[in-house]
């Protein structure tokens, strides 16, 4: 069975005035619920702060969590205007990506996070609708926590930015 990590905050964690197409998560969930595909939806755990720090500058992470990013940093990320759910949304997305990786490694073989792929964030800044880089966090955590994982290959085929 295909495991898909999903949380409603993926949609409502983005302000309804944002130009980001936030409805795509709930619409995808609805379409999959109505399909014949055997999908198990799993609600992710919120990521621990220590797991974010393994791939991002602590000063940047703390500024985001404490709501002290400057307007220039927020504009570079996008998703504006931000609402009061953006921090939890971000942490649930990262938790969903980690959950999918752990599921694949430990048993299932196939899993995904509906809002994962936030790979345009850099070490000390966000970019392109990505606050933190879930791909980097997952790769670093997998190599740290699973001794049989020594190498990870990430291929970014995005057309739009090429900075993943």
Q: For the regions a protein language model found, what residue spans apply to each?
A:
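HDAC/HDAC-like amidohydrolase catalytic core signature
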Residues: 1-155, 159-164
